[in-house]
Each structure stands twice: as C-alpha cells, then as structure tokens.
Amino acid sequence: MTIQQALETIHQKLQTFTQLAHRPKSAVTLLAVSKTKPNEAILEAYQAGQKAFGENYVQEGVDKIQYFEAQNIQLEWHFIGPLQSNKTRLVAEHFDWMQTLERAKIAVRLNEQRPANKAPLNVLIQINISDEASKSGIQPSQMIELAKHIENLPHLRLRGLMAIPAPTDNIAEQEAAFSQMEQLFEQLKVAFPHQQIDTLSMGMTDDMQSAIKCGSTMVRIGTAIFGARIY
C-alpha cells in the first residue's frame, strides 16, 4: 500500500468514526507521526494532502524542518516527544507546536527562546492520564497551576491537552481514560475563557475510535501511514 492509499484509508476511518460520534469530520485533525521516517516519505504524504507532521526527536525534527523550508514547502511541525531543558531552544526556534509540556521551567525557557518574528509557539499540556511511572505528563490536579504559568508567557499560546493512555484493547478502559481527558479539557476551557483552547490531542491507530467518541480533536497516526518503523 502506498502512503497515499494509507492516508485515504485513514481518512475513510475518520469519516466513519466522526459520523458515529455525531461530529463533523472537520472536527478531527490528522497528525502524521513521521519520526524515523525519511524526507521522501514525508514528501509523499504532503503530495497526498497531509500538512501536519509530528516528530519525537529534536535534532531529527529540526533537520527535516530545515530540509522542507529549503524546498519552500510549508508544513506544520509538532514536537510530540519528551523534551529536556537543554533542547528547548531548537524546539522554540523551529517547531509550530509543542504537545508534551509538563513543567513550568520548560515553558519559561520556550517562551524566552521563541524568536520574536515568529508567531507564539502553540503548546499542549501533557496529562499522565493512566498514572504510569514510565510516562511523561502531569497529574490532572496540576493542570490549572501549569496553565496559569503558561497564560503569563507572551510567546506561548495554550491550545489544550495531550495524552498517551496506557495501551489496552479493552474499549471500556480506552473510553474511561479518554472521557476523563475530555472532562479535563472542558475544565481548562472554563478556567481560561480568553485562551484559544481548542485542541485535545489523543488517539492513535489502535484507539482512534474511542478517542474520537470522547471528543479528540487530533489523532496521532504513524505506522498506519508510513508502515513499520525504520530505525
């Protein structure tokens, strides 16, 4: 299957899942997770209409961003991996979105390092919704406090929440985690009515339907678009 065919298949699924959830298809954005994938694969996806790409590794992502900028191809780049404080400058200078914000210290650095001639960096707070020791993200109880920090940083724009629940094939368990995220998302909107909080990034290939049922506005899909991972 070509990347174009894979994207068509995913868009058909998005159409089905949004209809079942009584939501317009336009309510859900597809983020193509392109980590470890070559520029040729990203170009193929772009030529098939894909504009938003997610990268987990800072330097690899920056190399790709610079490659496509040199080709004059305008893509939207999301950083979706864990971020160490010594790598914040590269994210602040090159990416459009940062989806894994979990510390005020990182927010302050991103704000200071965001170039003045660029639009504010769109950020999502990562919630550790399944309370896994191995996963990044904050506890739900810490959300409002971190959001208040972000609100005061002029070069960041708080757009919503992101989560990676513990993987499970049990639909009820998937929906329990995602519906908890949906409630937190609504709380965030109420608490910050003047912020453009419109993005709930959750759902991957195997739990996309549950995520969309529970209000996801962005699903992150890698293998189903690009095939098995290339190391």
Task: Give a label for each model feature.
Residues 216-231:
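Gly/Pro- and small hydrophobic-enriched strand-loop and loop-to-helix capping segments
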Residues 1-187, 191-206, 212-214, 226:
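Conserved alpha/beta-domain cores
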